[in-house]
Amino acid sequence: MSYRPSASFKIQSTDSKIHMKAIVFTKYGTTDVLELKEIDKPIPKEDEVLIKVYAVSINDWDLGLFQGDPINRLLNGLFKPKIKIPGSDIAGRIEAVGNNVKKFQPGDEVYGDLSGRWGGFAEYVCARENALALKPASMSFGEAAAIPQAAMLALQGLRDTGQIQSGQNLLINGAGGGVGTFAVQIARLYGVEVTGVDSSVKLDMMRSMGFDHVIDYKQEDFTKNGKSYDLILDVKTNRSIFDYTRVLSRNGIYAIVGGSLFRLLQALLLGPWISMISKKKICFVALKANKDLDYMNELYETGKVKPVIDRTYRLDEVPEALRFFGEGTHKGKVVITVKHDY
């Protein structure tokens, strides 16, 4: 884990009695639209908790949120964003609870995925209790923040969508990022042979994570090397759906996590037809946020799964962190640490 220093933002103040620092955007664009501001500290509703944030990890959705990609514009406002603070995967300590909260109390260390509500790139955030799990004492805040979305997609993609079974051949496309580094550790628990595809800068790390075979996508086309796979977990979806189905074994499953809008639409339109006329299944991984965090706690505490964190940044360095993340060279997760002066 490394630390990347950079120039800090100038704080912009507002007239609020109780305030906090947060990364805010009020229009779509590049990282230049992101500002570090002082805004009102949130107050939890009856069914919410107030969390003092200590770490947040970056996901693809964070990029799409402020860049205003088509899907995010449909969800978050066509011309002007409704949600103005990115960040979903958070870890921190509960500072206050609403009257209807039963599961947690002030002082509890928690983590979870706030997708749909966002607000994680801040010193404080409110969340419903069903979006959180207790953080094991042995787990750092940075590790906890790295888990929610990436680990849930990996676990649910393999176990639920992919119906993974012992003895299978698994290929993970985009294997060196957050989802892929969790997926290989989970897949090893099932006793499968795992091939990972990514860029050359990630291959050594991937080998150390337990991949049986690694492929540099610039040097070898895994859809034309004559090998077949029982299950493909695709984080990138950067090829035609017919390329993927060509290397799927009979009764194989192609599980789609994410990727380019064009390829996702192609899979959405043609997938049912391909599944109908062949024995091969084309499936999208439907994320059930936070569903299996307690199970991930068990895997972490027994040493079976450990988050891979490439770099950490400060809250005022979020634009730099997002630029690095957007380059696609990160190994595992990128984490923002939030320091408090009080």
Language-model segments: what does each one mean?
Residues 145-216:
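Mid-domain Rossmann-like dinucleotide-binding core that forms the NAD(H)/NADP(H) cofactor-binding site
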Residues 223-231:
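A short acidic, Gly/Pro-enriched loop at the edge of an enzyme's catalytic core
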Residues 109, 169, 252-253:
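Short glycine-centered segments of the SAM/dcSAM-binding site in methyltransferase folds
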Residues 3, 14, 63, 68-84, ...:
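Alpha-helical membrane-targeting segments
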Residues 288-342:
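C-terminal hydrophobic helical "lid"/dimerization subdomain
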Residues 239-302, 338-342:
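Glycine-rich phosphate-binding loop and adjacent beta-alpha segment
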Residues 79-80, 88, 96, 103, ...:
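NAD(P)H dinucleotide-binding glycine-rich loop of Rossmann-like/cofactor-binding domains
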Residues 40-57, 71-116:
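Glycine-rich beta-strand-centered segment in the early N-terminal region that forms part
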